[in-house]
Amino acid sequence: MSVSSNCREDIVKWAQERLRADNYAIIYKRQGEDTTQKKIEKPQITPISTNRDARSAFLEEVQNSVVEPLKAEFINFDEDMSRKALAEGVELLYAKNELNDLFELSFTFNLGNDYDPAMSIARGYAALLGSKDLSLEEFKAQMYQLASSMYVSVSNNQTTINISGLQENLEATMALVEGYLRNLVGDDAILRNYKDSFLKGRHNRLFNQQTNFSALTQYALYGGEFIDRVTLSDAEVEALTSEELLERVARLFELEHRVTYYGPASLEAISEVITKHHAMAEEPT
């Protein structure tokens, strides 16, 4: 039945059968002053008298104090820092922390993305894994209990493992971190998800103007051949295996590297601790 075939009576009948008595809305558009409107009376504003000319004793003390000009101090690497050879190809740079009981210990390897473009991928993948003895969550929980932290960074020319925390927990932290990094266990499912995320992020950066300007600057400075050499294609990223990436992490400890310590322990004491817990290759490459 078409709409045109319905008469007025049909529509009224349908409405009476199907529409409830209260199933409607009424809108009135009335002009004039609304006598039912309720307003809140404005409160009386009390002016605040200020004493702009008054000065407190503290202000007088600050204004009358004599401030000595700052004098620049420059680091003397021969006096402010000590050097010691821990093993062949491994040097310790030491500076004493006179302020508190916190330490910062870093291991710097001269291997970065310019030499091996997969290093940053290996770092990101390793950060998602557990070891033979600990899951990632268990490792994080133990680091938390020791009030310590670890961070691995990869730059163009260097890879750095940095740990920091309370000096009293240094030995336990070193043992935990080294045992964890040397015994990472691969997971193909995690690697698959990481590759997907990495490639998706790379694709999204193509639409970022700042990233494109930075890439253009790199191209102008170093040329296309260098950019190709230090940048993995999507196919090369897909071809990376878990074993290849974890081997890159493990081989770091076979390289010559620099150890930097800033903390309250003496040079002799920290040298013994590092030698005890930091396995170093007999013939580093």
What are these regions, as identified by a protein language model?
Residues Y24-Q142, L146, N162, A175, ...:
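His/Glu-rich zincin catalytic helix
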Residues E238-E243, R248:
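A small/polar active-site loop signature that marks catalytic segments
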Residues N6-E9, E73-D78, E238-L240:
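Extended non-catalytic domains of envelope/secretory-pathway proteins
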Residues G186-N193, P284:
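Conserved short beta-strand edge segments in small beta-sheet-based binding/regulatory domains
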Residues M1-S5, A25-Y28, E98-A127, S131-N183, ...:
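M16 family metallopeptidases and their MPP-like homologs
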Residues R8-K13, E17-Y24:
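Extended, domain-scale alpha-helical bundle/helix-rich regions
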